[in-house]
């Protein structure tokens, strides 16, 4: 049984850090005197505004470049950074729209000085938005370059493994190995440099100390020392509690530079004397969630109980201190603008100031140059136009009597419009028809030109003279350039969306031209050559920022050309082409990626090209029968339309080599003909040869999607013969009478594995290859050996598990035994094949297959040269050659196909269980359950290794394979009946069900019809650790191994098979009665339910009655749970079950678990309940709060602390956004 004391050691990425957003400890007036912690500010006069010169930057040495790249961590930080930049853009766009609305609303009764200030802020925000978009595009380019280097490094790693297999070989082989090793090292260094470059673009974290908060913990006169460590950056501060309840700290503010791989360590020490210092607590906090546009008030639990909290205000700036834009604080100027607005709107216009007089003179000169007429300064003529200038219609109409004011004194302006540009604009004006707003043409100059004699203003002025089109009101970053603007627009800033980004084809720079990643494959290939040939010289140039004169003239709103339209350097310009796909097989998030179209200005979902891999293997269209199989040498399937492959087709085995044909949406599907029992499908559709390599980063799930929880494996996409007939017989399943699998919805990203040829996307981070294999295993079905000489599924499954265990080494001590047994199994298999130990774990990777890791370079070039329909079909000779190569190489095998299939199933099961490890937060029952199952699998591999000398012998009974530690009559006999006439190693679930019903159906049907089937299903689900489908699924069914049967029976308390069947039948009947719609049946079952019969399913049924039952039933369930929880055995069993329910995917199940924990008054559930109160949905939060109040004094204290902390925080930091705003 699993014990609650088992707390596995955590790795650093998932260190136990409470993500509590609470600011608990804000004491009320009734707690320990009149102390008030509502404001944490030192006594005396209020603080001055933030001055950057006063802020201490706690870093003297730059963070060193990493030695080993960490792509997984970079993916997480990049995703959080993009989310923060997008939020920054949205906030400033909203502020800009607000100011523009304010300008329109305040034109009639306001003086021009107020409009001047508003328009100045609008222009400042526009410049900041352009700079922010350029910064985001630079980050996208760095990340795309990093993805290319990562794929090249994975390919070089495959080459090294390929050359390292077997003996050293010839001198040429050794030289090739040295070259591949050198390339791997160079790619690694390039990745490290790119990580360092990207780290330099993360901006700054401005931290402000808010104070300590504690529930009955802080006293007057207490002194504390807080030490924060962030990489090489330090911040140490001391503070004391004053008698007034305020806290005084010697340092209040600091600036931290964000780091990619480091965590913020906080240590709080209470100073009590000269040497008596007490460490209150020390925690490590995640910082990737601090990339947010708005200031965040975060609270960190310093100790385990959460009685001491550190409150910090964190402000993230996307730019460094030395590179701060002038408009970074424009969002905070709304109060000043509102004050001016209220002042100016109460009185008539006053005498113009000198600045306004200069503005009037400039407008008068402009008017005289254009038509020689004068314009009035009267408020009656301003109306609601955007400038005092009258439209052409108004000028030619009958003049009205206007009140003329005396001409102000001439005042020299800081700069004037050049004569040439002015004349040019006058020449172009008659050819254009400006849009009219309330009968007036908007004036081309802005009010901000009066006081801003900068290069930025001059460039904008020149741009407006060249192209005097009417600006689009309001910022609109989601605009693509049309075909007429491609040639004359120097740069198009990227489109920022949630998870989608498009880099600019060319960017104007004044320095060396940086290398950019372009969506077109040719530019990607160009980047690869540049980064590999001159990495030290080219990589730093990627981060060169342009001066304000270069990028400030780029107008995303107006799409106007700038003065720097000619790119200095070797930057290339690519015309966007419609319907351009960036890869043969898109990632999970690539299916919604839109490409620029020359005829549209906005991205449209209908212009998205989704290329799906339609892999069809004929043996999957079969209904396997363990008794009768019919060989089918040929099988033809005609697909009328190109549909998304189902899970049984799309997930390719790590060792299956299938030729995949790509189709565009709506294309007619090909005719697929299989001419061999070995499932290799030939397709006349245009395709490229893609080989799936298990150790490369080819197969992956989308980063935005979680891997499948592995409730049950999907159908295998390859031939699944029944190896239990004989250890040396190889038969193919009959395909006659099968039905084609229906394709699921196209929005199922988990079912589309990523091809090695897909280009890296800036919006889709790629996990590392070890996580790729695990995620692919979670989706892939458990394969079963066909017994061929070229069958490499065993070694591929072994290599996948070994790679996964490498990632978890040292993090979970429980996995040490499993790793030893898997390594022992690999050694025994190698010895059987006569291989040396120096050979790598994945022996199937040859040099030819390793070279295909670089196939994405050629594929991208082919995509750029040929259209979607110009691909050449792969020849049948190539297909046959690949199949021949795969069958000629040596493969690991025990000599018995059934045992091979059994080992493959257990290896993949271990890989799926590893996905459940490393969870964050206090909900760890699934993790503990997975560790327990992994310990069982270690015993299985130990048993297999101990009987390695008997691998070649054909076992005929279960007695020859396994032995129980205690006498358990009936179990092995039952297994022999299930595998009668077959191998005893593996059996189908359907056969076990038929055997069980035939043996126990007559006896159990006397009590209730269908009870035997329900008992057997429960037995199989408990043994397999997953739910079985209630309806028959197409394709081969689930398999059940003798070792799964043996390890499950070993953990049972039942002495015999008959006793187990009787106990399980009683439990099944109890669960059915508890789930009955008849209230009398439910109450009777509750009254007669014995303590020993209430196990997991019964406890779940009881907890569900707390949600779905009426008041009488709920009261009876509560009473029953309280009385039964007095027993220690039942209480531990119930506690584990209800805690496990808190991690269920169903909301009602989590609500039931919360209410049940409150009924048994479990203090062990306080921490998980508090976590749910902060992170889950409203229904679960309400149930968790109700349960906390029932968990005694400690639970009520936690509930009060939670409520106070939530009330003290702003509404934007409520429970619904906890995960994104807390540490």
From Swiss-Prot:
The modification Phosphoserine is found at residues 22, 345, 347, 451, 454, 468, 748, 874-875. One of its GO terms (molecular function) is 14-3-3 protein binding. Its main location: cytoplasm. InterPro entries: ARM-like (IPR011989), ARM-type_fold (IPR016024), FAM65_N (IPR031780), RIPOR3 (IPR026136). It comes from the Eukaryota. Keywords: Coiled coil, Cytoplasm, Golgi apparatus, Phosphoprotein. Residues 858-867 have a biased composition (Acidic residues). GO terms for biological process: cellular response to starvation; establishment of Golgi localization; positive regulation of cell migration; positive regulation of intracellular protein transport; protein localization to Golgi apparatus; response to wounding; Rho protein signal transduction. Belongs to the RIPOR family. This is Rho family-interacting cell polarization regulator 1. It comes from Mus musculus (Mouse). The gene is Ripor1.
């Amino acid at each position: 049984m699993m014990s609650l004391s088992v707390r596995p050691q955590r790795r650093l990425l998932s260190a136990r850090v409470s993500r509590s957003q609470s600011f608990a400890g804000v004491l009320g007036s009734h707690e320990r005197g009149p102390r008030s912690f509502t404001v944490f500010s030192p006594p005396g006069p209020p603080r001055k505004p933030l001055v950057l010169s006063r802020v201490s930057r706690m870093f003297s040495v730059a963070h060193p470049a990493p030695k080993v790249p960490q792509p997984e961590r970079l993916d997480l930080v990049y995703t959080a950074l993009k989310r923060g930049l997008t939020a920054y853009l949205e906030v400033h766009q909203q502020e800009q729209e607000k100011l523009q609305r304010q300008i329109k609303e305040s034109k009639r009764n306001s003086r021009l000085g107020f409009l001047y200030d508003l328009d100045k802020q609008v222009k400042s925000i526009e410049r900041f938005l352009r700079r922010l978009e350029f910064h985001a595009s630079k980050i996208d380019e760095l990340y795309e370059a990093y993805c290319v280097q990562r794929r090249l490094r994975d390919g070089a790693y495959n080459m090294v493994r390929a050359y390292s297999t077997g003996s050293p070989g010839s001198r040429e082989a050794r030289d090739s190995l040295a070259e591949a090793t050198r390339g791997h090292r160079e790619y690694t260094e390039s990745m490290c440099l790119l990580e360092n470059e990207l780290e330099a673009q993360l901006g700054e974290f401005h931290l402000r100390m808010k104070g300590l908060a504690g529930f009955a913990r802080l006293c007057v006169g207490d002194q504390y020392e807080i030490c924060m460590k962030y990489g090489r950056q330090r911040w140490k501060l001391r503070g004391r509690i004053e008698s007034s309840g305020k806290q005084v700290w010697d340092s209040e503010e600091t600036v931290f530079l964000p780091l990619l791989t480091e965590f913020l360590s906080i240590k709080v020490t209470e100073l009590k004397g000269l040497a008596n210092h007490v460490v209150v607590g020390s925690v490590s906090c995640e910082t990737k969630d601090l990339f947010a546009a708005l200031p965040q008030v975060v609270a960190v639990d310093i100790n385990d109980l959460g009685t001491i909290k550190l409150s910090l205000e964190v402000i993230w700036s996307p730019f460094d201190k030395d590179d701060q834009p002038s408009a970074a604080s424009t969002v905070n100027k709304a109060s000043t603008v509102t004050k001016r607005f209220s002042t100016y709107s109460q009185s008539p216009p006053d005498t113009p100031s000198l600045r306004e007089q200069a503005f009037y003179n400039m407008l008068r000169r402009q008017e005289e140059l254009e038509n020689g007429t004068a314009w009035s300064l009267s408020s009656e003529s301003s109306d609601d136009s955007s400038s005092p200038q009258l439209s052409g219609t108004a000028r030619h109409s009958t003049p009205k009597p206007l009140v003329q004011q005396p001409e102000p004194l001439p005042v020299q302006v800081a700069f004037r419009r050049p004569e040439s540009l002015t004349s040019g604009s006058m020449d172009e004006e008659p050819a254009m028809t400006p849009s009219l707003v309330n009968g007036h043409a908007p004036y081309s100059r802005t009010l901000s030109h009066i006081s801003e004699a900068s290069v930025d203003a001059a460039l904008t002025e020149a741009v407006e003279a060249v192209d005097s089109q009417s600006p689009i009101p309001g910022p609109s970053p989601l605009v693509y350039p049309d075909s007429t603007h491609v040639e004359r627009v120097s740069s198009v800033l990227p489109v920022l969306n949630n998870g989608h980004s498009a880099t600019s084809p060319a960017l104007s720079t004044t320095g060396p031209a940086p290398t950019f990643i372009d969506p077109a494959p040719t530019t990607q290939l160009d980047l690869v050559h540049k980064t590999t040939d001159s990495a030290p010289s080219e990589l730093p140039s990627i981060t060169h920022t342009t001066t304000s004169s270069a990028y400030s003239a780029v107008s995303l709103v107006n799409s106007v050309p700038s003065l720097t339209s000619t790119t200095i350097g070797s930057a290339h310009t690519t015309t966007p082409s419609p319907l351009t796909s960036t890869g043969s097989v898109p990632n999970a998030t690539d299916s919604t990626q839109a490409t620029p179209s020359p005829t549209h200005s906005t991205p449209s979902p209908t212009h998205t090209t989704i290329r799906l891999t339609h892999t069809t293997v004929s043996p999957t269209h079969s209904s396997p029968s363990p008794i009768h199989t019919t060989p089918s040498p040929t099988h033809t399937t005609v697909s009328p339309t190109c549909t998304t492959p189902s899970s049984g087709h799309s997930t390719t085995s790590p060792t299956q080599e299938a030729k995949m044909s790509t189709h565009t949406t709506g294309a007619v599907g090909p005719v697929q003909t299989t001419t061999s029992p070995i499932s290799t499908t030939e397709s006349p559709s245009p395709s490229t040869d893609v080989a799936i390599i298990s150790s490369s980063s080819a197969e992956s799930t989308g980063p935005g999607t979680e891997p499948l929880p592995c409730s049950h494996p999907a159908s295998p996409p390859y031939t699944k013969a029944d190896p239990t007939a004989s250890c040396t017989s190889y038969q193919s399943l009959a395909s006659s009478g099968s039905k084609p699998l229906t394709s699921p919805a196209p929005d199922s990203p988990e079912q589309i594995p990523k091809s090695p040829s897909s280009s890296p996307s800036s919006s889709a981070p790629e996990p590392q290859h070890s996580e790729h294999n695990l995620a692919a295993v979670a989706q892939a079905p458990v394969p079963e050996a066909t017994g061929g000489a070229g069958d490499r599924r065993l070694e591929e499954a072994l290599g996948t598990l070994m790679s996964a265990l490498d990632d978890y080494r040292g993090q979970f001590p429980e996995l040490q035994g499993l790793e030893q047994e898997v390594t022992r199994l690999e050694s025994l298999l190698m010895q059987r094949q006569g291989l040396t130990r120096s050979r790598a774990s994945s022996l199937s990777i040859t040099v030819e297959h390793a070279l295909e890791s670089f196939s994405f370079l050629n594929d991208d070039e082919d995509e750029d040269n040929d259209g979607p329909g110009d691909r050449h079909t792969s020849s049948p000779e190539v297909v046959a050659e690949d199949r021949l190569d795969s069958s000629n190489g040596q493969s690991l095998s025990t000599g018995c196909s059934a045992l091979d299939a059994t080992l493959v199933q257990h290896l993949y099961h271990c890989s799926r269980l590893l996905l459940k490890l490393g969870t964050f937060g206090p909900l760890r029952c699934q993790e503990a359950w997975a560790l327990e199952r992994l310990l069982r699998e270690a015993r299985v591999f130990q048993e297999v290794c101990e009987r390695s000398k008997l691998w070649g012998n054909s076992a005929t009974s279960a007695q020859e394979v396994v032995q129980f530690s205690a006498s358990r009559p009936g179990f092995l006999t039952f297994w022999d009946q299930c595998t009668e006439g077959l191998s005893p190693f593996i059996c189908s679930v359907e056969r076990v069900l038929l055997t069980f019903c035939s043996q126990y159906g007559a006896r159990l049907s006397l009590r209730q019809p269908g009870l035997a089937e329900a008992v057997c299903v429960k037995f199989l689900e408990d043994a397999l650790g997953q739910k079985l489908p209630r309806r028959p699924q197409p394709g081969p069914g689930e398999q059940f191994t003798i070792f799964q049967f043996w390890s499950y029976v070993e953990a049972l308390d039942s002495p015999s098979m008959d006793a187990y069947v009787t106990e399980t039948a009683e439990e099944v009947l109890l669960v059915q009665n508890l789930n009955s719609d008849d209230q009398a049946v439910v109450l009777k079952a509750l009254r007669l339910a014995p303590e020993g019969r209430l196990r997991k399913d019964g406890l779940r049924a009881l907890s569900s009655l707390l949600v779905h039952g009426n008041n009488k039933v709920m009261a009876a369930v509560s009473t029953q749970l309280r009385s039964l929880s007095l027993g220690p055995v039942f209480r531990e069993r119930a506690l584990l079950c209800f805690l496990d329910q808190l991690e269920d995917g169903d909301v009602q199940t989590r609500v039931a678990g919360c209410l049940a924990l409150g009924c048994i008054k479990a203090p062990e559930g306080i921490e998980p309940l508090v976590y749910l109160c902060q992170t889950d949905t409203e229904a679960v939060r309400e149930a968790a709060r109700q349960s906390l109040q029932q968990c005694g004094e400690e639970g009520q204290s936690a509930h009060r602390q939670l409520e106070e902390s939530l009330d003290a925080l702003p509404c934007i930091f409520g429970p619904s956004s906890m995960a994104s705003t807390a540490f």
